[in-house]
Amino acid sequence: MKSRLETRYTEQIAPELFKELGYKSVMQVPKLTKIVINMGVGEATTDPKKLDAAVVELEQLTGQKPLVTKAKKSLAVFKLREGMPIGTKVTLRGKKMYDFLDRLTNVALPRVRDFRGVPKTSFDGFGNYTMGIKEQIIFPEIDYDKVQKLRGMDITIVTTAKTNEEAYKLLEKFGMPFAK
């Protein structure tokens, strides 16, 4: 069964973008590929148990078991050795991706204090959008009383769009609240 946002994409958003952007084929219309959520836990170098809390929180958010990321290089400045766990990430595709984007745009982002929209400048030039969130407690799935430390996360939305303008129009139609 398709999610609400996925159904809206196939029935409403894709045909609108097809007309607006003047494509010759329906296959040219940009679509979402995946959403990658990354949570860097720098304190994990001294206390590995802090990473476990981040893994549990990310699993509650996405409904998917996160992958623990490890350091690629040793850096003496950060007391870091190659192979040490330093963060966690999840790659969402399909129904879970659309469900997460729906919750992000309609529930989580409006709960951010003094929220005026996400910046339009966070596109990478190839149609992908990356945003940072300072607190994980904006998501209703996270129990505020069980949070040991406020942690931020990076959310990257990967699309098939060729340019920033195409990706902007796609995400705007999905309901992403861009700053005016």
Swiss-Prot record:
Domain of life according to the entry: Bacteria
Ribosomal protein as UniProt keyword: yes
Gene Ontology process terms (BP): translation
InterPro entries, A to Z: Ribosomal_uL5 (IPR002132), Ribosomal_uL5_bac-type (IPR020930), Ribosomal_uL5_C (IPR031309), Ribosomal_uL5_CS (IPR020929), Ribosomal_uL5_dom_sf (IPR022803), Ribosomal_uL5_N (IPR031310)
Entry's Gene Ontology molecular function annotations: rRNA binding; structural constituent of ribosome; tRNA binding
Record key words, sorted: Ribonucleoprotein, Ribosomal protein, RNA-binding, rRNA-binding, tRNA-binding
Keyword match Ribosomal protein: yes
Matching SUPFAM superfamilies: RL5-like
Annotated PROSITE patterns: RIBOSOMAL_L5
GO annotation, cellular component aspect: ribonucleoprotein complex; ribosome
Alphabetical list of HAMAP family matching this protein: Ribosomal_uL5_B (MF_01333_B)
Family as reported in the entry's similarity comment: Belongs to the universal ribosomal protein uL5 family.
Job of this protein: This is one of the proteins that bind and probably mediate the attachment of the 5S RNA into the large ribosomal subunit, where it forms part of the central protuberance. In the 70S ribosome it contacts protein S13 of the 30S subunit (bridge B1b), connecting the 2 subunits; this bridge is implicated in subunit movement. Contacts the P site tRNA; the 5S rRNA and some of its associated proteins might help stabilize positioning of ribosome-bound tRNAs.
Subunit structure, as described in the record: Part of the 50S ribosomal subunit; part of the 5S rRNA/L5/L18/L25 subcomplex. Contacts the 5S rRNA and the P site tRNA. Forms a bridge to the 30S subunit in the 70S ribosome.
Protein name: Large ribosomal subunit protein uL5
Species of origin: Mesoplasma florum (strain ATCC 33453 / NBRC 100688 / NCTC 11704 / L1) (Acholeplasma florum)
